[in-house]
């Protein structure tokens, strides 16, 4: 979904505008109506904004609020989730640092469709090793699937292999209230840093 405001600032003053290093590039994907844009603008403005379906993409710079991600800048590309737009996802995931895949935890009828798109994204050669955070959205609604159920329905273990080797984590969240969003961003940031450290170590060993 889209709010019709790209790259706009929050008006938070001089300190907020100061750079804090190179931003982490994040692609936010998921089926249409999963709540991607609501999550993006809740992270950006810390308030709920009514949105309309995204035709194309939204791009915003957001800042981590807790944990190791606190103060870290993220450049988040929220890409439309309609079926006709999904072939474009690969253009946004190329060279990205991490992926947020938003899932509607209540929409059981489309979980198989979400699984198919998640699997396709995770197994794309361009995305090999890229950390993925599955944002289990709409946890405030009755009938929302719990994390363990979603992991099973989405085939997370099938995608990632044995426990402990996973670059995919699931974070329960509610985009409207903001619950779980910054926790998820922090988790993804730690996965990104872990991957970068491992790559650096491997380069040293190869010398």
Where are these regions (language model features)?
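TRAFAC-class small GTPase G-domain
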Residues: 1-199, 203-207
């Amino acid at each position: 979904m889209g709010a019709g405001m790209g790259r706009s600032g929050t008006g938070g003053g001089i300190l907020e505008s100061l750079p804090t290093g190179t931003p982490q590039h994040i692609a936010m994907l998921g089926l249409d109506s999963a709540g991607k844009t609501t999550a993006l603008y809740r992270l950006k403005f810390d308030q709920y904004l009514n949105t309309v379906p995204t035709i194309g993409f939204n791009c915003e710079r957001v800042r981590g609020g807790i944990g190791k991600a606190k103060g870290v800048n993220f450049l988040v590309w929220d890409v439309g989730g309609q079926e006709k737009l999904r072939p474009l996802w690969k253009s946004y995931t190329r060279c990205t640092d991490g992926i947020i895949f938003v899932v509607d935890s209540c929409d059981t009828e489309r979980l198989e469709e979400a699984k198919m798109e998640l699997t396709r994204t995770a197994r794309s050669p361009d995305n090999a090793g890229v950390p993925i955070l599955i944002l289990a959205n709409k946890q405030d609604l009755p009938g929302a699937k719990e994390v363990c159920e979603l992991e099973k329905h989405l085939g997370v273990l099938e995608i990632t292999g044995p426990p402990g080797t996973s670059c995919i984590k699931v974070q329960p969240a509610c985009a409207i209230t903001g619950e779980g969003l910054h926790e998820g961003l922090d988790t993804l940031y730690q996965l990104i840093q872990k991957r970068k450290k491992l790559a650096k170590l491997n380069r040293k060993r190869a010398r």
